Amino acid sequence: MKTIIVIGAGIVGVSTAIWLQRSGFKVTIIDQKGPATGASHGNAGILAASSIIPVPNPSLIKKLPFYLLSKDSPVFFKMSYLPKMFPFLISYLSKSNLREVNKYAERMTPLIFDTVCQHKSLAKGTGAEKFISYQDYCFGYETKENFLNDKKVWKLRQKHGLPFEVVNGNEFSNFDPFYKDLFDVIVKCKNHGKINDPGLYVKTLCDHFLSQGGELIISKVNDISSKNLNDVIVKIESDSLIANKIIVAPGAWSKKILKKFKIKMPLESERGYHVEYVEPNFYPKVPMMLTSKKFVITPMDGRIRVAGLVEFAGLKTLKRKPPLNLLKNNIKDLFPNLKCKEKIEWLGHRPALVDSLPMLGYLDKNKQILVAFGHQHLGLTAGAKTGRIVSDLIIGNDIKLKISNYRPNRFMN
């Protein structure tokens, strides 16, 4: 039986491990903290099939002065970190044009359009099935003018076959009074889903993996190297492990692990925040993206999660108050009557490459090391399918998308 090591126990790593295990491989997951302790824990829980518009887009350039100078900006920069990330930022912002947005949409759609079905297939026969539900994902616009300013965005989604319905905000509030008097226009995206507790979902999947004979090692990975044409060595804190293949999928921490391979990897953390309102006095019925404020309100089991924003401050900086205060102040202004038992604050690291596409494929000519990371805001959405693709690559099955779009060496000169 061939042995495989998966580095990373987020949704991408756990999904990969389960699909490989189902195909008959002996699989070990290594993670420095354990399953779903990063972005897979604290995301908004949306299976966002329509999220084919990257963060760097024409509107980002138009609003950049506001984002840099306003305390109400949904994009945050730690000024002392800017010099370090300046080359990344220049390349990242250079993608903020229609040609690059169209390219991204064309390449991301095949990875996420069937996200709910992919997650249902992944979770089938496990205790994690109960966390998945079909759910419209809504976008709220405070004015009709704001909606019309986004017309190109919706035309692009329509072009890629993503169904949606535009409804009057007042009529919508009859269905969901939580959002009463907030929006003139609401767009309901169909064929979407929700994970009711993303962290517990991934942990439950990992528990299933372990129950089927998989292994989980909690350790930092110090090095990976090729032993010979058949084996790869992974050095962890207290041991060295040998496997036939290694999958590198620790999200924003991938760059450090792969540094020795000298592959060009313009990767940064798009830091995201959430505030949870535990046992609130009233709930929304559906998840809502507040388009002007760039955060999502998601009803979850026993709480409301308010998640979003983008912050560039690196992996080492701890939670910062300005993004959290912005989320809390916005909720206080929008929902003055909302009360809760407790508020829980969280920071996570989304792995983002300059073109916003993941790295997915073999790193070396001997096909021993495979990478799967860089899904930025869409790790949960694309995670189940990414795991299946990795499994298919190793087995040699046909893959029904153009895998070269995500090749690891695409940034090499």
Language-model features: locations:
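A conserved short coil-to-beta-strand element within the FAD-binding core of flavoproteins
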Residues: 167-175, 217-232
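N-terminal Rossmann-fold NAD(P) dinucleotide-binding loop
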Residues: 13-14
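Rossmann-like flavin
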Residues: 86-204
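Glycine-rich FAD pyrophosphate-binding loop
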Residues: 22-41
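Active-site substrate-recognition segment that forms the wall
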Residues: 45-46, 51, 55-95, 223-231, ...
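Beta1/beta-strand and adjacent pyrophosphate-binding region of the FAD-binding site
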Residues: 1-10
